[in-house]
């Protein structure tokens, strides 16, 4: 791609020529930094200067005096504008030249002008300049040395043309170069260079010349710096003569690939179709570079940005009918290969990572396709319900949005996109509240031990000398043990009676104390001769692990220090805990075998109901991988493998290859739990003797909880039976309510949904017919305005917006050629519906516009809205103001027609 002078104006050529221009002026060409910045305060690399920020801030010494780069950047703050405007992107390249205490303002301006007009050949008469209002030096250089006429140099305020790293630190004025797409318009109306249809900023020069202190005072920098940025996509648009950045050779090939896979032509497409193709082109570039830099799809941080962008690509592709080349599977990898092919001159690592990128895209797309199909149908019903509830200002509740997210995995941003397209608002605040409430419910309720109690228990341990002896590996009952200490309300007591909540220390116990992710045992402590009983709800370690402390309620009798007791763990609870704990070990091994040896534990919870396992993984397991994990665990359960547990030196355990538990600290002697051929871990928890005792294993859910951290929740043993019984009960209850066999439930529900939709449509049609009938009765109330026009302004309560529209249309048809109709409806809830319909004759005769008249009426009713000159709809929140508002509307119309 070359211009009239034979110069390369392709995206690659523009990039190469920029770098070579500054290399010829003694700038060191440096590589682009990663999209994952070293600066912990920034999520993604958003500017070319970011890799040099420590130098500009005086935190690092410069390695070179001057530099030039092409920096890959990602910004998502304007994601909703992608494809809408000519130049908004998520991914873009920023060409830059930098000076670290070397050259300054005069050279930076001269070179910016030279590369723009000489190297790139831009028409000097079409370049406009902005400077900071107080930067007389830059103004003079542009005017006197470069020769820019004063009427093409604009002084801007601090908000537009002054850069600062923060409230304190380096700062300085900016100067920007703008390209004029329409010089024929002259200088009028261009005072602020803010007409996006005419001007585009393509080069920004930052002159870091001051440092601001905490009092806001600015002093000159000892070493002045230059930071510049030229948008590659913008310069390509200018040089290639394209109407927008998307049609340059940097993005258009990606768009054309998507269009071809959808069987359409971009050039022949309507605006809505072009918008979706632009989103695909832009977002595909972004996700390719992000994944290449190690950012994988997840629900947190940078990973969520990748997931969000990719899901927008998938949804746009589905709406356009984009198909994979082979007609099946994921389509995103094929489009990504085009973007990857365009990447080499910007970042060669993208091409090297092509297989990784395509694998991630395919995995994520296929997972999301299932979610999208299920969620779209449910969301459609929710949006229809929202419109039925309030047609004037329909809003999807936060609870519904959260249900879509929590139950069906439908992300909020996609919900918002779909709702916006349907004209429905989303209660985002309500969604966040529902999310917070769910987190509160799921958070483990653990009461922190008061510091004073901890000190007291430490003193008790010192007094007793011997630590609590744990006997729970071999038995769930220990007879003849003694009560060594009693605590009540944080204080040591000699005895406690029925109803008291106490903490009990025994000299020996079968109760497992919480640790290694496993909860403490529950059970009971019985006094000798059955003189009393304590119900144990938990057991924990205290005093540096020397004491086992039992949390109890005295249910019968009186217990005192020195009493002989029998401690018994609940056999049912222990059985569940053992099954879940051993299943956790099997789960980790299955994950390593299925996903890879790089999988490592990041946390766990084993209780009596279920197990939770957190693990590090670069990406989410696929449904097929989870199915294999589940199958492996159940296979080992079926193999009836005997477990062994042995204490040994930690050095020997490491030699044997035992895996350590996450977050645990170990002494010189450790306990190793071995499932031969499957798993070997350092673990102090309780386990089954044979895998067959687990009974069964079922994954309940898998999700992301942090960047690169996944969570699996599952049940085993009796928990599987509980799950099956619960689901069986639900199925039977549904079958009973629907009066069909269980296997016919799905079909019956689908039929009922279709019946409901049909009934709703019929009801809507009847409401429309009723409104038209009411309107016929109102026709006689029309008044004759000057000029022969008919004016009818009336109230029709109890009518929804759709029916109100039908009524207005029928009245216009019935009353003649020159008609103005305004109808209002007030409900018991205080809300107002409004509609206006003006014929063309009324519009011309009175200069009336339905949207303007109705907008004022709606405003008087505490609402808003509008429409076209001939037809408009609106709503309000104050039905008490409706009568007066309608009278004002009538007066406005009649007065206009009287002129």
UniProtKB/Swiss-Prot annotation:
Zn(2+) binds at residues 581, 585, 683, 687. Its EC number is 6.1.1.7. It comes from the Eukaryota. Binds 1 zinc ion per subunit. Disulfide bonds: none annotated. GO terms for biological process: alanyl-tRNA aminoacylation. Its cofactor is Zn(2+). It is found in: Plastid, Chloroplast; Mitochondrion. It catalyses: tRNA(Ala) + L-alanine + ATP = L-alanyl-tRNA(Ala) + AMP + diphosphate. GO terms for cellular component: chloroplast; cytosol; mitochondrion. The keyword RNA-binding applies. GO terms for molecular function: alanine-tRNA ligase activity; aminoacyl-tRNA deacylase activity; ATP binding; tRNA binding; zinc ion binding. Keywords: Aminoacyl-tRNA synthetase, ATP-binding, Chloroplast, Ligase, Metal-binding, Mitochondrion, Nucleotide-binding, Plastid, Protein biosynthesis, RNA-binding, Transit peptide, tRNA-binding, Zinc. It is an enzyme of class 6 (ligase). Monomer. Consists of three domains; the N-terminal catalytic domain, the editing domain and the C-terminal C-Ala domain. The editing domain removes incorrectly charged amino acids, while the C-Ala domain, along with tRNA(Ala), serves as a bridge to cooperatively bring together the editing and aminoacylation centers thus stimulating deacylation of misacylated tRNAs. Belongs to the class-II aminoacyl-tRNA synthetase family. Catalyzes the attachment of alanine to tRNA(Ala) in a two-step reaction: alanine is first activated by ATP to form Ala-AMP and then transferred to the acceptor end of tRNA(Ala). Also edits incorrectly charged tRNA(Ala) via its editing domain. This is Alanine--tRNA ligase, chloroplastic/mitochondrial. It comes from Micromonas pusilla (strain CCMP1545) (Picoplanktonic green alga). The lineage of its organism: Eukaryota, Viridiplantae, Chlorophyta, Mamiellophyceae, Mamiellales.
């Amino acid at each position: 791609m070359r211009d009239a002078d034979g110069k390369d104006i392709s995206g690659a050529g523009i990039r190469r020529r920029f770098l070579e221009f500054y290399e010829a002026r003694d700038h060191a060409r440096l590589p682009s930094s990663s999209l994952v910045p070293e600066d912990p305060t920034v999520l993604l690399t958003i500017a070319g200067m970011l890799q040099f920020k420590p130098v500009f801030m005086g935190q690092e010494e410069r390695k070179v005096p001057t530099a030039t780069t092409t920096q890959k950047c990602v910004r998502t703050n304007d994601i909703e504008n992608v494809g809408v405007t000519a130049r908004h992107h998520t991914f873009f390249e920023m060409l830059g030249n930098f000076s670290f205490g070397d050259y300054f303002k005069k050279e930076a301006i001269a070179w910016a002008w030279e590369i723009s007009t000489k190297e790139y050949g831009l028409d000097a008469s079409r370049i406009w300049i902005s400077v900071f209002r107080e930067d007389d030096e830059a103004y003079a250089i542009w005017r006197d040395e470069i020769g820019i006429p004063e009427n093409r140099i604009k002084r801007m305020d601090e908000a537009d043309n002054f850069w600062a790293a923060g409230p304190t630190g380096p700062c300085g004025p900016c100067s920007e170069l703008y390209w004029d797409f329409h010089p024929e318009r002259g200088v009028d109306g261009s005072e602020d260079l803010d007409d996006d249809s005419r001007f585009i900023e393509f080069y920004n020069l930052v002159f870091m010349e001051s440092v601001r202190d905490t009092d806001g005072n600015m002093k000159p920098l000892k070493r002045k710096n230059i930071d510049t940025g030229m948008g590659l996509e913008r310069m390509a648009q200018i040089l290639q003569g394209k109407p927008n950045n998307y049609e340059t050779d940097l993005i258009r090939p990606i768009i054309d690939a998507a269009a071809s896979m959808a069987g359409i032509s971009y050039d022949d497409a309507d605006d809505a179709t072009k918008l979706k193709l632009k989103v695909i082109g832009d977002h595909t570039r972004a996700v390719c570079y992000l994944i290449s830099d190690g950012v994988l799809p997840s629900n947190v941080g940078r990973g969520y940005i990748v997931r969000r962008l990719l899901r927008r690509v998938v949804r746009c592709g589905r709406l356009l009918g984009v198909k994979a080349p082979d007609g099946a599977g994921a389509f995103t990898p094929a489009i990504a290969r085009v973007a990857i092919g365009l990447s080499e001159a910007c970042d060669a690592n993208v091409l090297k990572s092509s297989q990784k990128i395509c694998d991630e895209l395919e995995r994520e797309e296929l997972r999301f396709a299932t979610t999208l199909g299920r969620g779209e149908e449910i969301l459609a019903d929710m949006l229809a319900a929202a419109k039925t509830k309030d047609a004037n200002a329909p809003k999807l509740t936060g609870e519904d949005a959260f249900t879509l997210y929590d139950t069906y995995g439908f992300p909020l941003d996609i919900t918002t996109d779909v709702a916006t397209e349907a004209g429905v608002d989303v209660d985002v605040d309500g969604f966040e509240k529902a999310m917070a409430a769910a987190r509160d419910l799921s958070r483990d309720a653990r009461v922190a031990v008061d510091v004073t109690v901890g000190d007291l228990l430490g003193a008790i341990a010192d007094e007793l000398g011997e630590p609590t002896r744990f006997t729970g590996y071999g038995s769930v009952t220990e007879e003849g043990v003694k009560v060594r200490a009693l605590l009540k309300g944080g204080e040591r007591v000699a005895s406690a009676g029925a109803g008291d909540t106490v903490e009990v220390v025994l000299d020996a116990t079968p109760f497992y104390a919480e640790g290694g992710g496993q909860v403490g045992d529950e059970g009971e402590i019985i006094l000798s001769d059955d003189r009393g009983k304590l119900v144990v709800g938990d057991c924990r370690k205290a005093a540096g692990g020397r004491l086992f402390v039992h949390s109890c309620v005295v249910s019968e009798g009186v217990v005192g220090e020195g009493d002989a007791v029998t401690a018994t763990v609940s056999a049912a609870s222990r059985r569940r805990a053992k099954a879940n704990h051993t299943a956790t070990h099997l789960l980790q091994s299955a994950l390593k075998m299925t996903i890879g040896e790089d999988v490592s534990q990041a946390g766990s919870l084993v209780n009596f109901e279920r197990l939770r396992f957190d693990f590090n993984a670069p990406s989410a397991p696929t449904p097929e991988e989870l199915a294999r994990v589940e199958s492996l665990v159940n296979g080992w359960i079926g193999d009836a493998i005997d477990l062994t547990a042995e204490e040994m030196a930690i050095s020997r355990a490491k030699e044997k290859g035992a895996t350590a538990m996450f977050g645990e600290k170990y002494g010189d002697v450790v306990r190793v739990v071995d499932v031969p051929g499957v798993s070997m871990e350092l673990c102090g928890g309780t386990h089954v003797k044979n895998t067959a005792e687990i009974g069964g294993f079922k994954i309940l859910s898998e999700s992301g909880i942090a960047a690169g951290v996944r969570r699996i929740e599952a049940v085993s043993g009796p928990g599987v039976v509980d799950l099956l019984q619960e689901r069986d009960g639900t199925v039977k209850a549904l079958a009973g309510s629907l009066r069909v066999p269980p296997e016919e439930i799905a079909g019956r529900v689908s039929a009922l949904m279709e019946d409901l939709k049909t009934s709703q449509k019929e009801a809507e049609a009847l409401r429309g017919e009723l409104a038209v009938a009411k309107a016929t009765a109102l026709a006689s109330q029309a008044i004759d305005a000057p000029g022969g026009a008919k004016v009818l302004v009336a109230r029709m309560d109890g009518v929804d917006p759709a029916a109100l529209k039908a009524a207005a249309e029928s009245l216009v048809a019935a009353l003649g050629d020159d008609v103005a109709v305004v109808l209002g409806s007030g409900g018991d809830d205080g809300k107002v519906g409004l509609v206006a319909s003006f014929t063309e004759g009324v519009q011309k005769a009175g200069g009336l516009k339905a949207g303007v008249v109705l907008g004022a009426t709606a405003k008087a009713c505490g609402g808003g809205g509008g429409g076209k000159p001939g037809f408009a709809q609106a709503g309000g929140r104050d039905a008490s103001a409706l009568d007066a508002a309608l009278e004002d509307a009538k007066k406005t119309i009649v007065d206009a027609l009287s002129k």
